[in-house]
């Protein structure tokens, strides 16, 4: 039996119908679904958007969308979409609605998100997805899969054009993880956000493996794999991190990031002078590279990106004289700063993202080289180190390198060497630049002795190490040969970075050869 819509004659009746429909669209899943959500302590899809964007700035699009010809269709079709402002700049936002078909992807869901992505490309603004979805809508069969593919195609079109960000606030399974993994930043809430292609039950049935939900797709585990870039403790912290991240970025690849408080502290400060004593006298003693970073950039402001993956390298954003720079720094607190597979991938990805949005790069170097080991070789250190190298050369933004202490072997090359197109290279007097460290060179020497542990051999070893550190692993040879532009007092670093970025602000590369694209090692 078909229900006939009442014929409305007056404007007042039409306005009343509009209000009734909009009220129904606020909670399309009904009171029961809303109560179930509230009992779990989960905010509504709209409440999440309101907390992310600037107050009063959200304009919803498609609230009255629903699948045509479906008697069970609900308004919104499982997703809230619209436009708002973050830090006063436009963004596109969508948020999955768990009360409508579990936030799964259906026909109008796909159309709404696809249109939002096209709008972001058209106006040149970031897109942020708040993800809490059950994946594909089974009852929609191939239609749901088709829309996943359609959205995937649009992610590729937006890639490198505008920033794409995903916030994971629930159990995102199957198709629901393919969109987030294509975005530039993935933020998840600990013990709330999960990502996996197939759940524990399916894995048990297919392979016989027993695995818990947390082990399989928990935020911390996925962060260690490099799939999630920031794990936070609450939804509020996730929204704040996204706001902070976007504050360092341009709205699109043709724009420039906001300039924040330029001209601060134009003279050397007490914090600058602390750099003169920050590097330990012993080469084998660790220190936290963050202590250096907080002193060489504006306001001690540094935003870590992907802190839980590849911890031998720190990546993140800071400002030099109010302007954004991307930072790639070794972390002596983790494996002495030796670069492993995960750190290589992390650095390569960060460099390519920064280059896509024309963000200058600063390399801060203290590494004994690439991490040796059978597992590293099995897992592709050659190829993955090659990606790192490729990304550094490919990036044509301004690049400045500060060598603080160790810079050995192949790691010397990838950490912003002049030979890989760095524009300006500086070193502290504490820098040790060589093919290999003194201890490694001594190990090679000891192979000549029948008994390396003999007192005579050990005395020769000690003398060799001292001589190597005094005459080989020093910054002066690199400076003499033009590989280092200047050896500087550590306390000069912050202001020297400022001068360098001013000089390089209008950097142009006229010698680039026209081609479709190079082939990164994959």
Swiss-Prot record:
What positions does the domain CoA carboxyltransferase C-terminal occupy?
A: 270-503
State what induces this protein: Expressed at higher levels during the exponential growth phase.
Answer yes or no on keyword Transferase: yes
Keywords from UniProt, A to Z, are: Transferase
Domain CoA carboxyltransferase N-terminal as annotated: residue spans:
11-261
Task: Name the Pfam families on file.
Answer: Carboxyl_trans
Q: What's its EC?
A: 2.1.3.-
InterPro entries named in the record:
AccD/PCCB (IPR051047), AcCoA_carboxyl_beta (IPR034733), ClpP/crotonase-like_dom_sf (IPR029045), COA_CT_C (IPR011763), COA_CT_N (IPR011762)
Question: What EC class does the entry list?
Answer: transferase
Where is it found, in Gene Ontology cellular component terms?
Answer: acetyl-CoA carboxylase complex; peptidoglycan-based cell wall; plasma membrane
Q: Which GO terms describe its molecular function?
A: acetyl-CoA carboxylase activity; propionyl-CoA carboxylase activity; transferase activity
Q: Which BP terms in the Gene Ontology apply to this protein?
A: carbon fixation; mycolate cell wall layer assembly
Its annotated function is as follows: Component of a biotin-dependent acyl-CoA carboxylase complex. This subunit transfers the CO2 from carboxybiotin to the CoA ester substrate. When associated with the alpha3 subunit AccA3, the beta5 subunit AccD5 and the epsilon subunit AccE5, forms the LCC complex, which is involved in the carboxylation of long chain acyl-CoA. The LCC complex can use C16-C24 substrates, the highest specific activity is obtained with carboxy-C20-CoA. Has low activity with acetyl-CoA and propionyl-CoA.
How would you summarize the oligomeric state and partners of this protein?
Answer: The biotin-dependent long-chain acyl-CoA carboxylase (LCC) complex is composed of AccA3, which contains the biotin carboxylase (BC) and biotin carboxyl carrier protein (BCCP) domains, and AccD4, which contains the carboxyl transferase (CT) domain. The complex also contains the beta5 subunit AccD5 and the epsilon subunit AccE5. The four subunits are essential for activity, but AccD5, together with AccE5, probably plays a structural role rather than a catalytic one.
Q: Give the similarity note.
A: Belongs to the AccD/PCCB family.
PANTHER family registered for this protein in UniProt: PROPIONYL-COA CARBOXYLASE BETA CHAIN (PTHR43842), PROPIONYL-COA CARBOXYLASE BETA CHAIN, MITOCHONDRIAL (PTHR43842:SF2)
The name of this protein is Biotin-dependent long chain acyl-coenzyme A carboxylase beta4 subunit
Source organism (scientific name): Mycobacterium tuberculosis (strain ATCC 25618 / H37Rv)
State the organism's lineage. Bacteria, Bacillati, Actinomycetota, Actinomycetes, Mycobacteriales
């Amino acid at each position: 039996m078909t229900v006939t819509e009442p014929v409305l004659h007056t404007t007042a009746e039409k306005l009343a119908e509009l209000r009734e429909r909009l009220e129904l669209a606020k909670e399309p899943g009904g009171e029961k679904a809303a109560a179930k959500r509230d009992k779990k302590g989960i905010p509504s899809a709209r409440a999440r958007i309101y907390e992310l964007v600037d107050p009063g700035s959200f304009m919803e699009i498609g609230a009255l969308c629903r699948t045509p010809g479906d008697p069970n269709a609900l308004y919104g079709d499982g997703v809230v979409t619209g436009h708002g402002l973050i830090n006063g700049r436009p963004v596109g936002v969508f948020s999955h609605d768990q009360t409508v078909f579990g936030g799964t992807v259906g026909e109008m869901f796909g159309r709404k998100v696809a249109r939002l992505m096209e709008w972001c490309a058209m106006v040149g603004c970031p897109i942020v997805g708040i993800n809490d979805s059950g994946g594909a809508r089974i009852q929609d069969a191939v239609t749901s899969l088709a829309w996943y593919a359609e959205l995937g195609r649009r992610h590729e079109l937006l890639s490198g054009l505008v920033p794409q960000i995903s916030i994971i606030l629930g159990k995102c399974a199957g198709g629901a993880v393919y969109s987030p993994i294509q975005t530039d930043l993935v933020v998840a809430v600990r013990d709330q956000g999960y990502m996996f292609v197939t759940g524990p039950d399916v894995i048990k049935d297919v392979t016989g493996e027993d695995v818990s939900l947390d082990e399989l797709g928990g935020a911390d585990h996925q962060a260690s794999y490099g799939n999630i870039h920031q794990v936070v403790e609450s939804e509020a912290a996730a929204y704040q991190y996204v706001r902070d991240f976007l504050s360092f970025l341009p709205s699109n690849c043709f724009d420039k990031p906001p300039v924040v408080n330029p001209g601060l502290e134009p003279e050397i400060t007490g914090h600058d002078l602390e750099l003169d004593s920050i590097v330990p006298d012993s080469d084998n003693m660790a220190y936290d590279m963050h202590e250096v970073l907080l002193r060489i950039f504006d306001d001690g402001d540094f935003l870590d990106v992907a802190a839980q993956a590849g911890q031998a390298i720190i990546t993140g954003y800071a400002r030099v004289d109010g302007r954004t720079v991307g930072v790639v720094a070794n972390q002596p607190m983790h494996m002495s700063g030796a670069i492993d597979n995960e750190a290589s991938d992390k650095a390569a990805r960060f460099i390519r993202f920064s280059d896509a949005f024309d963000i200058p790069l600063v390399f801060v170097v203290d590494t004994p080289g690439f991490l040796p080991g059978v597992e590293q070789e099995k897992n592709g250190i050659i190829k993955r180190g090659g990606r790192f190298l490729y990304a550094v050369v490919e990036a044509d933004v301004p690049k400045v390198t500060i060598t603080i202490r160790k810079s050995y072997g192949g790691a010397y090359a990838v950490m912003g060497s002049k030979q890989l197109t760095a524009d300006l290279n500086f070193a502290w007097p504490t820098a040790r630049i060589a093919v290999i460290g003194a201890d490694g060179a001594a190990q090679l020497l000891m192979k000549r002795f029948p008994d390396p542990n003999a007192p005579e051999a050990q005395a020769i070893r000690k003398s060799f190490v001292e001589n190597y550190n005094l005459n080989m692993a020093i910054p002066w040879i690199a400076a003499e040969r033009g590989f280092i532009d200047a050896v500087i007092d550590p306390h000069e670093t912050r202001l020297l970075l400022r001068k360098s970025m001013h000089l390089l602000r209008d950097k142009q590369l006229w010698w680039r050869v026209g081609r479709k694209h190079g082939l990164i090692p994959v």
